């Protein structure tokens, strides 16, 4: 399927799209390059800015996958399903040929964090553990935590399914757990999200991200939480409405600069749209085969940027 999209990408004329929502992202890149401060960070020099917000429509199945470079959407989607299952075992991603967590789960990296007790590929109590078993004592990535900790995601689902509670202002899911930060391979960057239902029917998600790698990570986070909103809307009998992205520390790594300067000169295409075809009994049963492309993902060519562990 990806080959078909690549073919479409090559054949489509490069015409200006009325995709003003992606232009928000391109403007963020430009602003950081032009006005950001140069900082020496944990893993390299960055152009840095603090505090930004972007808003994307999810109406009619739209999903904001950045088009001014080719995004590895399958990798992004599979990572989300892995989070939803509550997994922290990188081996499961490796088996799907997804390597985005390899550096952070290597023996050397875990040792650098003082996590000598974790075996290689065990990421500790990161996103999935906090979403499904918040603050449950973490043993290892093979332990069954069913019934332990707080299942934040299931709580939100239960509230959304009930017309009497779906307008609650407490539909919050946090991956930031100060009690377990030092046990994680990497503290959560996208740390807290809140869901909101408008007029009893339209579901939106707001994400606060404390640290945003604007070149690589932020496009993944936009697509991932937008897909999560679509899945929850389907699962709970609602319609996806908007994704709102709040960013704290927004940064561009110095060695991403050349690629991003190419990207900001490109004109975006329209965002694709999807349908969640099946409705499962349990949220963890959704998988990539449940996604149907209504309007395909068309993009410019990929741009190489190194991930900073």
What are these regions (language model features)?
Residues 5-309:
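Terminal, non-catalytic protein-protein interaction segments that mediate quaternary/complex assembly
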């Amino acid at each position: 399927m990806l080959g078909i999209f690549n073919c479409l990408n090559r054949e489509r004329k490069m015409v200006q799209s009325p995709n003003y929502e992606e232009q928000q992202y391109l403007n963020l890149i430009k602003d950081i390059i032009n006005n950001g401060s140069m900082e020496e960070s944990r893993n390299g020099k960055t152009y840095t800015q603090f505090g930004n917000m972007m808003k994307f429509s999810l109406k009619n199945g739209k999903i904001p996958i950045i088009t001014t470079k080719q995004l590895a959407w399958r990798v992004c989607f599979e990572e989300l399903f892995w989070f939803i299952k509550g997994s922290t075992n990188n081996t499961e991603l490796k088996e799907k040929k997804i390597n985005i967590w390899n550096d952070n789960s290597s023996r050397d990296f875990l040792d650098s964090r003082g996590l000598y007790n974790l075996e290689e590929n065990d990421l500790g109590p990161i996103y999935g553990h906090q979403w499904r078993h918040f603050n449950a004592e973490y043993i290892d990535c093979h332990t069954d935590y069913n019934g332990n900790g707080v299942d934040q995601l299931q709580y939100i689902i239960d509230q959304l399914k009930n017309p009497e509670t779906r307008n609650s202002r407490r539909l919050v899911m946090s991956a930031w757990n100060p009690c377990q930060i030092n046990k994680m391979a990497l503290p959560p960057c996208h740390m807290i999200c809140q869901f909101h239902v408008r007029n009893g029917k339209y579901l939106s998600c707001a994400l606060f991200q404390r640290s945003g790698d604007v070149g690589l990570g932020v496009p993944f986070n936009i697509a991932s939480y937008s897909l999560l909103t679509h899945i929850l809307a389907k699962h709970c009998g609602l319609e996806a409405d908007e994704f709102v992205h709040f960013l704290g520390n927004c940064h561009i790594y110095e060695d991403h600069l050349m690629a991003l300067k190419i990207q900001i000169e490109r004109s975006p295409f329209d965002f694709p749209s999807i349908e969640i075809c099946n409705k499962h009994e349990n949220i963890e049963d959704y998988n990539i085969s449940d996604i149907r492309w209504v309007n395909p993902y068309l993009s410019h060519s990929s741009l190489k940027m190194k991930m900073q562990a």
